[in-house]
């Protein structure tokens, strides 16, 4: 038990340190890309959403890609749940066949996208102001030059995603 507490404290310390250092040295979207990469370690998807064991774990970007090549670079060669992690870019919600984490960058259109994805096990992420209110799961926001998270637990439950308590500790819960 003591080892578990030390491990949890170390993970939380690492995340806060990463946030602070990256906010100072990296661009805003590099920090957000790091989060997208790491979200997969703090959520559980139902096995049916993961598909066959040989299928990749897909991080998607819908709309304009603000990450450049950075997200591709940090995910190259990485595995999530023994699956290769791949980044895919989509111009339309209708182009998405399989996606596990989706960053939505379609200002003013996220509500329509979220309605289309409702009930599917996709972690939806955006930095749009009303994202959580519209049914999005994780919203990035800035607080004193630090990237923070706001999580809509009802939306996560609707998507059949289990959010780790470790992630919840560093996030603001949307109510």
State each model region's role.
Residues 2-10, 21-175:
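Short hydrophobic alpha-helices and adjacent helix-cap/hinge residues
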Residues 13-19:
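Sec-dependent N-terminal signal peptides of Gram-positive bacterial secreted proteins and lipoproteins
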């Amino acid at each position: 038990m003591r080892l578990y507490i030390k491990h949890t404290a170390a993970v939380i310390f690492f995340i806060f340190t990463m946030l602070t250092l990256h906010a100072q040295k990296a661009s805003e979207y590099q920090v957000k890309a790091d989060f997208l990469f790491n979200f997969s370690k703090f959520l559980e998807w139902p096995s049916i959403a993961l598909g066959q064991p040989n299928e990749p774990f897909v991080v998607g970007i819908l709309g304009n890609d603000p990450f450049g090549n950075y997200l591709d670079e940090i995910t190259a060669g990485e595995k999530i749940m023994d699956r290769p992690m791949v980044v895919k870019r989509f111009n339309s919600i209708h182009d998405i066949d399989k996606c596990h984490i989706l960053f939505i960058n379609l200002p003013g259109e996220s509500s329509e996208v979220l309605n289309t994805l409702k009930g599917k096990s996709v972690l939806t992420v955006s930095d749009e102001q009303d994202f959580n209110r519209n049914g999005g799961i994780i919203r990035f926001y800035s607080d004193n030059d630090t990237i923070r998270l706001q999580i809509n637990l009802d939306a996560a439950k609707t998507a059949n995603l289990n959010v780790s308590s470790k992630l919840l500790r560093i996030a603001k819960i949307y109510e």
